Amino acid sequence: MGSNPTLAASLRHQGYPMSSTCTHIDAVGQLAPPREVCETCIAIGGEWVNLRQCLTCAVTLCCDSSPNQHMSGHNRATAHPLMRSAMPDQDWSWCFVDQAMLRETPGGWETFDPFLEAGTSMVGEYLAAGGSPDPAPDFVNEHGFPLGDWFAFVREARANGELEPRDAARLEAIPGWRW
């Protein structure tokens, strides 16, 4: 998955957890590839922004940025808990119930936090270039990523016991990192 800091920051600021356990993975069915249209928008003459595919029944519907928000409506109507992006070059999934980002790995499904991962991938370069491990809260790096906000977010998550041990270990392995 390519990191999407805008999506990640949006989810984080909406109060979604850093990562959590999803207990709905067994709801993933055998899926055909997603369609290139919102099946409901086509039927009613609507328009869509991005597409999502239900991981239970494989229907392809529009996202919450679209006027009709058919995928969220599908979740409310059917209680199908999981969906994935049906957009090219996006391979993330979402559990509506657990409010968790998911991805399929060779070892199975895992939850993850895209904001945490995007920052983790950038902080090593930043620190190696002489960046401060205590940047200003409003510091944004040359890629437009809010690293100051990210440092505060990670430290707060650790202080609150919300940082996964695997994520803490990744950070602690970065030269120059400190809590």
In which residue ranges do the predicted regions lie?
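Hydrophobic alpha-helical segments that drive targeting, anchoring, or assembly
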Residues: 52-53, 61, 157
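Short, positively charged low-complexity motifs
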Residues: 1-4
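Cys/His-rich, Zn2+-coordinating zinc-finger modules
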Residues: 20-26, 32-34, 44, 60-110
